[in-house]
């Protein structure tokens, strides 16, 4: 039993009619100009063929005659052919001009699409290009928390410790400063600081 499954698209239909009418339709090389009204001839010849419908034939014929192969074949001096390859008259000048204009327009559209595609690819590549990372600046060391110096624990100086040469601390209000007793005059005591400066202070301001 023959396979009667319908053809799926215009490409398959063109291949099928090229097989049925090899002297008229070709799949390779320059195509021959077709007889005017050849669609009706096709529809009549394939009327009982379950593989293809008139709608499919019309779409396939439109695709075939708008291909670059076919438009290249429509040139001065070329002859139209019928389904069996028989000549059906020479092409008219207006038909040649129309075919050449259609070919130029089709090529221009393809070129425009190609340029648009190239532009799109470049833009996508540019967008996907990883951005150069800025050199990381050396992190500044965070200020270490200031360690509060605990004041040196001192005690009140005993009267027996008020002797020349003894090391003492002078209470200066903001803190104690090391000093050496150089002279004792009752409650007044002369001391010498570590920087060599001498001063008289009250005994009550001295601590051990």
From Swiss-Prot:
SUPFAM superfamilies for this protein: FinO-like (SSF48657)
SMART domains membership: ProQ
Keywords assigned by UniProt, alphabetized: Chaperone, Cytoplasm, RNA-binding
Top-level lineage group: Bacteria
Subcellular location(s) per record: Cytoplasm
Keyword Ribosomal protein applies: no
Main location: cytoplasm
Family, per entry: Belongs to the ProQ family.
Protein name in the entry: RNA chaperone ProQ
Gene (UniProt): proQ
């Amino acid at each position: 039993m023959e396979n009667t499954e319908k053809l799926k698209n215009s490409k398959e239909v063109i291949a099928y009619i090229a097989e049925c009418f090899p002297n008229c339709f070709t799949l390779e090389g320059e195509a021959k100009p077709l007889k005017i009204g050849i669609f009706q001839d096709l529809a009549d010849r394939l009327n009982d063929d379950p593989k293809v419908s008139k709608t499919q034939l019309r779409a396939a014929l439109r695709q075939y005659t708008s291909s670059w192969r076919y438009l290249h074949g429509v040139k001065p001096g070329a002859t139209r052919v019928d389904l069996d390859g028989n000549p059906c008259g020479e092409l008219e000048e207006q038909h040649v001009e129309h075919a050449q204009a259609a070919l130029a327009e089709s090529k221009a559209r393809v070129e425009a699409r190609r340029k648009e595609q190239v532009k799109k690819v470049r833009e996508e590549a540019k967008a996907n290009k990883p951005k150069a990372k800025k050199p990381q600046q050396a992190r500044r060391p965070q200020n270490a928390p200031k360690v509060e110096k605990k004041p040196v624990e001192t005690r009140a100086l005993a009267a027996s410790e008020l002797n020349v040469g003894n090391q003492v601390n002078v209470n200066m209000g903001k803190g104690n400063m090391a000093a050496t007793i150089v002279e004792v005059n009752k409650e007044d005591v002369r001391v010498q600081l570590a920087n060599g400066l001498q001063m008289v202070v009250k005994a009550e301001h001295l601590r051990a």
